[in-house]
């Protein structure tokens, strides 16, 4: 798996704050477990399809990419690209710009559940290694 970076722009491709989104909140230097502390691994993402087929995606409409990313980094390193690969255009009415507090809370609860399941799996894996 590889996670890249992108640049935030307006509809006319003028840079918008915060500019480049490179997901430096988690890096190889701070370890795979740091991915459990963030609310997503970022975009864009690319997956090694043969491995992905052995893991599978959760059958949900939110957070499935995060769940798979956590599962992958349990055993494999995730590659990083810090240079922007594309521009992400933002404008008023963008679908992810105005989520209700109820939707944000539901999304966060689900991601907390994903982290809990992954943490439990890592504890089991480490116990079996002893």
Q: What function would you assign to each model-found segment?
A:
Residues 28-115:
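Conserved nucleotide-sugar donor-binding catalytic segment
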Residues 122-130:
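Non-catalytic N-terminal targeting/anchoring module and adjacent flexible stem/linker
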Residues 12-14, 96, 128:
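Intrinsic disorder/low-complexity detector
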Residues 15-25, 101:
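Short, flexible, mixed-charge acidic loops at enzyme active sites
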Residues 1-18:
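Conserved donor NDP-sugar-binding/catalytic core segment of glycosyltransferases
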